[in-house]
Amino acid sequence: MNAIVALCHFCELHGPRTLFCTEVLHAPLPQGAGSGDSPGQVEQAEEEEGGIQMSSRVRAHSPAEGASTDSSSPGPKKSDMCEGCRSLAVGHPGYISHDKETSIKYVSHQHPNHPQLFSIVRQACVRSLSCEVCPGREGPIFFGDEQHGFVFSHTFFIKDSLARGFQRWYSIIAIMMDRIYLINSWPFLLGKIRGIISELQGKALKVFEAEQFGCPQRAQRMNTAFTPFLHQRNGNAARSLTSLTSDDNLWACLHTSFAWLLKACGSRLTEKLLEGAPTEDTLVQMEKLADLEEESESWDNSEAEEEEKAPATAEGAEGRELASCPTESSFLSACGSWQPPKLSVFKSLRHMRQVLGAPSFRMLAWHVLMGNQVIWKSRDVNLVHSAFEVLRTMLPVGCVRIIPYSSQYEEAYRCNFLGLSPPVPIPAHVLASEFVVVVEVHTATRSNPHPAGCEDDQSLSKYEFVVTSGSPVAADRVGPTILNKMEAALTNQNLSVDVVDQCLVCLKEEWMNKVKVLFKFTKVDSRPKEDTQKLLSVLGASEEDNVKLLKFWMTGLSKTYKSHLMSTVRSPTAAESRN
């Protein structure tokens, strides 16, 4: 936990003072703070619970070193400190604990070494013992701001037979810059800090009772002349906390308590990455994976049944079953989850746009988004595979149906991406259809000008690409909104390929949300056409191309989402009609 825990005291001579503080160091110790870690200069203590090992950073100080250290320290001067304002002896550099699990160091000293931290702790100390107090002057309180940090403060009294009112005022504060984290840690900090306070008060009470028993002050108080003015009693106004509790190891114990408090408070609350509901692509992929597993289990079960029926011919039956059982690659191809080869000819949509040219790429992208059949004819199988891998990123997973490479033409209802070898004939009515686009790859007679601009890739310069369709997209046609935004991202050279990919993901999510709204509105609620037109206007998708795109993308919705809506979401009008 990135916080500072400090013990503060209101001195009768000097006002609020910081006695002892513990801070967390994630980075290597600063110069001077870690000098006590060298061999022969560190007093090792026994290993504490939780993997924390404490040591006292004791080193020899020459008079010159002590003077230089005091002059550079952000703390108060020696003349402004009394015995009650000082915790560690002069020349004592403090304590340090090493957390082996997290490689974090917990360092304790009287004041933070960093001037900015010293100022923050000093201000919190003054406020906790002056203006920011709870009723009764004992108890917890919360205060702070964004600039100086947020503070959890718990004030308390320690018995002292020689102090004014027979008690001295202290506070334990925890300072953080994260307000929400500190507020959420309130119950934990309150319970643990109250335990530390109770232990201190218990030790001080025993000393107080012993002093009162040995030297009662009642007669002295009765003989003292009355005066309306406050004055110092005949005693030491600067008694240290170690003398009040009669505990020489007090600061070492406080260090272990504060270090454990910081570690435990940081461990009890952890940040978790909260992901939203799964996307439609994720749901579709999960459904296809479940179908593959179910089909694979059915093949295994049928094979086991054959072996039981004919044990004598089990070997032959197994051979026939293996021959008839589709392989995993065929499963993936059939469900549109085909994986491309390692060799990638087309690197990205931007790369393909450079190779095909802007007009041809726009025509191809328009047909892809509309759900029309895209046919690639080439002898290079890797080229066709890489083209489909790039083009499929424009569509939701549920809308992709790929046959990577076939020896015969397949109908559009079976696939919207079809790879063919050049000799395979395509029916005439398909070539003339406005719902089909064909990309023919020929060997170039001369160097193709487009790949020349593609950085270090010259593998496509030997090809010529001819994009044809029965209904070419007019140059002045507006096209779907997502296509225009996609082309704007592809033409923006200030955007890297990775940024363009993320932009495309955001665009698909935006339009899939519109598809979900339209599906519920039309299929579940069964609203009239007039209301549907108003909805499309609100969605910004009233144009013809946008409507076609939404209807095609609606086929890519997962079965899980559709069944959920159909079973749980019903409109009031539909419920009344059923009743």
Swiss-Prot record:
Expressed in kidney. It holds the Pfam family Folliculin. InterPro entries: FLCN/SMCR8_DENN, FLCN_DENN_C_sf, Folliculin, Folliculin/SMCR8_longin, Folliculin_DENN. Residues 493-558 form the dDENN FLCN/SMCR8-type domain. Phosphorylation by ULK1 modulates the interaction with GABARAP and is required to regulate autophagy. It comes from the Eukaryota. Interacts (via C-terminus) with FNIP1 or FNIP2 (via C-terminus). Component of the lysosomal folliculin complex (LFC), composed of FLCN, FNIP1 (or FNIP2), RagA/RRAGA or RagB/RRAGB GDP-bound, RagC/RRAGC or RagD/RRAGD GTP-bound, and Ragulator. Interaction with FNIP1 or FNIP2 mediates indirect interaction with the PRKAA1, PRKAB1 and PRKAG1 subunits of 5'-AMP-activated protein kinase (AMPK). Interacts with HSP90AA1 in the presence of FNIP1. Interacts with HSP70, STUB1, CDC37, AHSA1, CCT2, STIP1, PTGES3 and PPP5C. Belongs to the folliculin family. This is Folliculin.
